[in-house]
A protein has these predicted regions:
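Glycine/serine-rich anion-binding loops at beta->alpha junctions
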Residues: 46-75, 93, 202-217
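ATP-binding N-lobe of GHMP and related small-molecule kinases
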Residues: 1-55, 73, 77-85, 119, ...
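Structural signature of FAD isoalloxazine-binding scaffolds in flavoprotein oxidoreductases
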Residues: 1-5, 67, 98, 120-123
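Contiguous, small/hydrophobic- and glycine-enriched helical/loop subdomains that border
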Residues: 42, 64, 68-105
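Short, basic/glycine-rich phosphate-binding loops at helix/coil junctions
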Residues: 6-14, 19, 67, 164-174
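Conserved, helical-rich catalytic subdomain that frames metal- and/or nucleotide-binding sites
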Residues: 100, 105-203, 218-228
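Residue-level signal for inorganic ion chemistry
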Residues: 1, 26, 60, 94, ...
Length: 230
């Protein structure tokens, strides 16, 4: 993120298919603050993506959060993290969490965040199959389904497990209703989870709307073995 004398926002990315205009959350994040505070100078954003696109990992929200934080600091706007979160939710439900970070209980559309203790140290293996998923389509499909009570994760049980700092209990409380939609359409998601578990993951689950899968390991070698097998 660079400050420029020339007014306006310039966005460069390392991926040719990413938009470099107001269709990009990073661009919109800069515009949001600069317009509100009447910033006369410009900003140059060089975005190098590592988080896969359309992977259910809040990659765009992470970019936007970084830009909000950077523009606030660079131009001395004086906003607190809470104030940035209040603005960020206007752009995307995941942005407040990306600004707060850590472990949290997320309620509402994602803007109501309650900090929780960090989970115990472990290894996390992330695997994205060669497919992309539209979050909008997944949520629309979920809305059309009739969910039972047992389809929903045990949030209270998860919080208790986190407070007890028991990684096995935490993993045992995994749950993601969106997996009913995405994994039902793409069996490879369940296949990846199975490989991780067979190689020693305490549990594995789809991230967000998918298709990315993550597994928790307490043994670094087991995580490495799963990585090599996948």
């Amino acid at each position: 993120l660079y400050r420029t004398k020339e007014p306006g926002i310039r966005l460069e990315t390392n991926l040719f298919y990413l938009p470099n205009n107001e269709q990009n959350l990073a661009y919109r994040a800069a515009a949001l603050l600069m317009e509100e505070f009447g910033v006369k100078e410009g900003v140059s954003i060089k975005l190098k993506k590592f988080i896969p696109v359309s992977a259910g990992m809040a990659g765009g929200s992470t970019d936007a959060a970084a830009v909000l934080f950077g523009v606030n600091k660079m131009f001395g706007l004086g906003l607190s993290i809470k104030e940035l979160m209040e603005r960020g939710v206007k752009l995307g439900a995941d942005i407040p969490y990306c600004l707060m970070r850590g472990t949290a209980l997320s309620e509402g559309i994602g803007e109501e965040l309650t900090p929780l203790p960090q989970i115990p140290q472990c290894q996390v293996l992330i695997a994205k199959p060669g497919i992309s998923v539209s979050t909008k389509v997944v949520y629309e499909s979920l809305d059309a389904m009739e969910l039972k009570q047992e389809d929903h994760p045990d949030i209270d049980g998860m919080i208790e497990a986190i407070n007890r700092q028991n990684i096995h209990e935490i993993a045992g409380k995994f749950g993601n209703v969106l997996e009913l939609v995405t994994a039902g359409k793409y069996p490879v998601i369940g296949e990846i989870e199975q490989v991780m578990k067979e190689e020693g993951a305490v549990n594995a689950m789809m991230s967000g709307s998918g298709p990315t899968v993550f597994g928790l390991f307490t043994n670094p070698q087991a995580a490495q073995n799963a990585y090599e097998k996948l």
